[in-house]
């Protein structure tokens, strides 16, 4: 399995409140997915490369972030560095039920300037060499209007060149001026998407839909090759070639932190789909990895806690 995956998005410094104080790390939805993809590939010793595309500063914290990603096996060749910008930061507070509250400092983060400062033709030349392009709703939400148009045009060209486009909407209301703008943007990217890895709660919050069937009906109109609609601890609905199949999870009784549950699911899904071409096996792999991640604190669990898929 010789494949190249490009992951586009934002990574931030992560501060985690623990019983003993504060712990510093890094996280961001797409970076989490990139790390877990790289780990799975390395553990199986397969020829699958994962490159992260974003922007950071030229400060020592940005240096530390890049070194950490490299240690995880993520290619950082195309991470842009801007001397006048810094990475964003977020703080996680965990609740007793395993859910969490986030507090962000990201308005002037370097990643917000990446598309604006880079030439689309240059990015296309680089990215068209990849088999699969992965991005999320947050990748879109942090762009200004002009950059958003540039990014969507870039994805359109990459799709036309034969790249597989994978999208996770990961809707975060606070990042969008209005729900209507998020809807318009998501509809544009879904029209270019091959594999949609979405979350039912996010979709229903954005579209005010009452039932899963309402959401499925809307999404299937995009003609997606694969649609996965995740429902947290219950399982997910997988739709391929118009056929719906529910894939349940195995109950996890020691959940401590749901950070990166969806991101890790996506990584395992993509990895297993690339190796097996079986969407159901891919969803089961997603459940396995996500089920392990939520038993640990933080977005990125310890290497020795990784399951075998």
Where are these regions (language model features)?
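Conserved N-terminal subdomain of the carbohydrate kinase-like
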Residues: 15, 46-137, 309
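Conserved phosphate-binding/catalytic region of the ribokinase-like
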Residues: 3, 208-309
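Structural alpha-helical scaffold elements that stabilize or flank donor/cofactor-binding regions
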Residues: 125-126, 188-189, 220
């Amino acid at each position: 399995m010789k494949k190249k995956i490009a992951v586009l998005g934002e990574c931030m410094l992560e501060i985690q409140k623990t019983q003993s104080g504060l712990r510093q790390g890094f996280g961001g939805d797409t970076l989490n997915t990139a790390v877990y993809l790289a780990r799975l590939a390395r553990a199986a010793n397969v020829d699958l490369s994962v490159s992260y595309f974003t922007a950071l500063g030229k400060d020592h914290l940005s240096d530390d972030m890049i070194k950490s990603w490299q240690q995880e096996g993520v290619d950082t060749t195309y991470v842009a560095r801007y001397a006048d910008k810094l990475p964003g930061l977020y703080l996680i507070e965990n609740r007793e039920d395993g859910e969490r509250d986030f507090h962000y400092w990201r308005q002037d983060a370097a990643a917000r300037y990446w598309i604006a400062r880079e030439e689309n033709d240059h990015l296309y030349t680089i990215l068209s060499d990849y088999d699969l392009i992965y991005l999320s709703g947050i990748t879109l939400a942090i762009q200004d209007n002009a950059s958003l148009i540039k990014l969507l045009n870039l994805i359109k060209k990459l799709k036309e060149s034969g790249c597989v486009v994978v999208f996770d909407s990961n809707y975060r209301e606070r990042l969008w001026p209005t729900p209507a703008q998020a809807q318009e943007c998501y509809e544009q990217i879904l029209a270019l998407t091959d594999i949609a890895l979405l979350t039912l709660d996010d979709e229903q919050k954005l579209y005010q839909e009452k039932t899963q069937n309402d959401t499925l009906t809307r999404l299937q109109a995009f003609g997606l090759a694969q649609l996965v609609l995740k429902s947290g601890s219950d399982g997910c609905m997988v739709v391929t070639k118009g056929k719906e199949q529910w894939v349940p999870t195995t109950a996890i009784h020691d959940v401590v932190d749901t950070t990166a549950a969806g991101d890790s699911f996506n990584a395992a899904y993509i990895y297993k789909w690339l190796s097996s071409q079986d969407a159901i096996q891919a969803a089961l792999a997603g459940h396995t990895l996500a089920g392990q991640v939520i038993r640990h604190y933080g977005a990125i669990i310890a290497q020795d806690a990784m399951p075998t898929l």
